[in-house]
């Protein structure tokens, strides 16, 4: 099953949109944009499913959850960064290994959001580090839905170093 159109970078337009959104947020005065929250956590091998989650926004309106299983090596330090737009209608969740490429073999992964719907989601086999750039997974290796970015069983090649999600608040009916 193909990923919903417009949710992933196929032509570069979504990357441009995300870059512009992030640049606009970076150029605004600090007092008008919520401070991003970055939390370090260990990604642990052993084949057991683990989860890590964080909340952000007024009243912890949004949640980002990273669920995974991996093999090989030892624990790796990863980070989850969350931030909201000035009007709190958009939030970003970035999960990554700051040292670039992970040496763990991921058997599965899923990054999901609560309280919002994904407008852009991307997964990378290698995160930017020093002079190296992000290397995205192939489109067939992962899927993006309204609430999650996750591996495609049988197609995912077990390399993961970064996930990026930009989501918009779900509308609440009166």
From Swiss-Prot:
Record-stated family: Belongs to the MYDGF family.
GO cellular component, one term: endoplasmic reticulum-Golgi intermediate compartment
Reported function: Bone marrow-derived monocyte and paracrine-acting protein that promotes cardiac myocyte survival and adaptive angiogenesis for cardiac protection and/or repair after myocardial infarction (MI). Stimulates endothelial cell proliferation through a MAPK1/3-, STAT3- and CCND1-mediated signaling pathway. Inhibits cardiac myocyte apoptosis in a PI3K/AKT-dependent signaling pathway.
Coiled-coil region(s): none
Keywords from the UniProt entry: Angiogenesis, Apoptosis, Endoplasmic reticulum, Golgi apparatus, Secreted, Signal
Name of protein: Myeloid-derived growth factor
Source species of the chain: Bos taurus (Bovine)
Subcellular location: Secreted; Endoplasmic reticulum-Golgi intermediate compartment; Endoplasmic reticulum; Golgi apparatus
Segment forming the signal sequence: 1-32
PANTHER family attached to this UniProt entry: MYELOID-DERIVED GROWTH FACTOR, MYELOID-DERIVED GROWTH FACTOR MYDGF
A single BP term in Gene Ontology: positive regulation of transcription by RNA polymerase II
Superkingdom: Eukaryota
